[in-house]
Amino acid sequence: FSPKTGCIKSWNYRKSWNGKDEWFYPVIIDNMMNLELLYFASKVTGDPHYAEIANSHAITTAREQFREDYSNYHVVNYDPETGKVLHKQTCQGFSDNSAWARGQAWAIYGYTMAYRETKKPEFLEMAQRTAEFWLNHSNLPEDMVPYWDFNAGQEGYVPEWEYDANDFKEIPRDASAAAITASALLELYQYVDKKTGKRYYQAAVKTLKSLAS
């Protein structure tokens, strides 16, 4: 954790996926899942420092890692000396500006969990907004199991890796992203109004039925 960036570094120094940029302090959206351990550490030790780090990371991630529509960037690279954001990119998604499905799932679960642990309204808002992005996306299949990236193969999204649509008979799905999101929604529905909660619950059940079929 760095007080200058306000978040936890995910990897040591490395080159970006396309090899064009240097990542000095890369932070991935996946880190939202790991904050639960820090909240637990504060509970069992009585030391609030761990939870404070988790809160700082979640707040910084909400500010720097999300787009206006509440989709997120997989990787944000910071300058470790100044805390300034240098790059917003991907390492596993279709393109830098696309919505990698598992990354969206990490966010929904992560902010739902952060709200459970803190009851901070801004975390509940993030959980709902990221959930709404997922549930309302025009490219979410009827069975609720997403394509591996919501924007894979779409116009305006250019991958900087050797992608050839002919290699795939159809766009692959991401069952793990579906399971993560279903788990998050089964908790999130308890924290919102009854009407919204019912929609989240039904979406989770539909997702699980698809995964189990």
Model regions and ranges:
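Glycan-recognition and catalytic cores of secretory/periplasmic carbohydrate-active enzymes
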Residues: 1-213
